[in-house]
């Protein structure tokens, strides 16, 4: 058996079951394990309880149980500067950002990685469901997690091979029920803790209320593309393309079909709505994306056919990717039209099991027509 006792792994511990089991597994495998809790947001829930304090208590219980040292590090300034200002800027532009992708790139795998290296780490480890594979020359490839329901490569798609050389994903070969079982058998305090949902590090806040603290809402007209006014919207930032809930207009007429958000006009402050899940205004034939990041330096050529996801947990779609002349932008053409392409979200590229990288969606098109989504 390999002796890992001289290999230090710093585990990003959130107070959840996944990162708890990561620390447990690495400790069982004989690594020199250190737990670190990242506090990235000054947070209290609606009952006035600081959720970060509660999570840190869980980290302490787990670390004490498995016998590892643990620390807390405050990244609030880095999070504000690198993630949250980006998040607000995107909403101001009428887009729907994905802060988790940026949070991983800038905080968990940059600020935290740097901090861990200062602690003498050889590697960092997190509770992400993803796998790594390395070539003989050290190039790292990012692969989907075995648990297809939990695979998190979508959120890791802006990391590069050099960063991943210093990373471990011990849960990549596991499925969630087995992770919980391990935690229960080991008597970990987090074994039955529910998974967190919501924005990276901000948790389960009322999103509308939360966003309203930082950006003034400007109500405006809610109307159809042919000019029928259907009501008033609360502020364009609260709506995303394809959304059904929260519009306050029920189905009407004989068909009684529900209404959906089918467009936005930031300049005129209009929210466009249309009837039917398959409303033609919701379908795009291609998109343009920029802010491109690929995991490896492999030359993919100017055109390549792969699959892509346009949001987390969506089924892959076949696409052809075409680079512009200076490789700063791609046009992604879909094998079949895709519903509710959303500017600000990530388009993530896959070749089979491998996550190749991603870009941020700037605009969606139906043939030559740009869709009015911002």
From Swiss-Prot:
SUPFAM superfamilies: Adenine nucleotide alpha hydrolases-like. CDD domains: MnmA_TRMU-like (cd01998). The record marks 128, 345 as: Interaction with tRNA. InterPro entries: MnmA-like (IPR004506), MnmA-like_C (IPR046885), MnmA-like_central (IPR046884), MnmA-like_central_sf (IPR023382), Rossmann-like_a/b/a_fold (IPR014729). The active site is at residues 103, 200. HAMAP family: tRNA_thiouridyl_MnmA. Belongs to the MnmA/TRMU family. This is tRNA-specific 2-thiouridylase MnmA. It comes from Lactiplantibacillus plantarum (strain ATCC BAA-793 / NCIMB 8826 / WCFS1) (Lactobacillus plantarum). The gene is mnmA.
């Amino acid at each position: 058996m390999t002796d890992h006792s001289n290999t230090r792994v710093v585990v990003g511990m959130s107070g959840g079951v996944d990162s708890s089991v990561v620390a447990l597994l690495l400790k069982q495998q004989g690594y020199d394990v250190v737990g670190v809790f990242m506090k990235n947001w000054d947070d209290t829930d609606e009952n006035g309880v600081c959720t970060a304090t509660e999570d840190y208590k869980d980290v302490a219980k787990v670390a004490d149980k498995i016998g590892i040292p643990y620390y807390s590090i405050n990244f609030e300034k880095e999070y504000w500067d690198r993630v949250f200002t980006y998040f607000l800027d995107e909403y101001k532009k009428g887009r729907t950002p994905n802060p988790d992708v940026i949070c991983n790139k800038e905080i968990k795998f940059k600020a935290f990685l740097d901090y861990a290296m200062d602690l003498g780490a050889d590697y960092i480890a997190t509770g992400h469901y993803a796998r790594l594979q390395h070539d003989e020359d050290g190039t790292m490839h990012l692969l989907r997690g075995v648990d297809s329901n939990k695979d998190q490569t979508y959120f890791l798609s802006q990391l590069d091979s050099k960063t991943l050389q210093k990373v471990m994903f011990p849960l990549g070969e596991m499925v969630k029920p087995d992770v919980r079982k391990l935690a229960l058998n080991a008597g970990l305090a987090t074994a039955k803790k529910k998974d967190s949902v919501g924005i990276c590090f901000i948790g389960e806040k009322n999103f509308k209320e939360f966003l309203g603290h930082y950006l003034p809402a400007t109500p405006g007209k809610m109307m159809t593309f042919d000019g029928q006014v259907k009501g008033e919207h609360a502020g364009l930032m609260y709506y995303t393309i394809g959304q059904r809930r929260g519009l306050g207009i029920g189905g009407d007429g004989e068909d009684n079909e529900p209404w959906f958000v089918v467009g936005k006009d930031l300049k005129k402050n209009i929210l466009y709505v249309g009837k039917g899940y398959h409303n033609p205004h919701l379908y795009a034939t291609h998109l343009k994306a920029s802010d491109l990041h690929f995991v490896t330096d492999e030359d993919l050529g100017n055109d390549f056919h792969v699959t892509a996801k346009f949001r987390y947990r969506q089924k892959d779609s076949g696409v052809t990717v075409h680079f512009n002349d200076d490789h700063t932008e791609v046009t992604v053409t879909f094998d079949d039209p895709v519903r509710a392409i959303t500017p600000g979200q990530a388009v993530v590229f896959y070749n089979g099991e491998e996550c190749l990288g991603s870009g941020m969606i700037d605009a969606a098109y139906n043939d030559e027509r740009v869709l009015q989504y911002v």
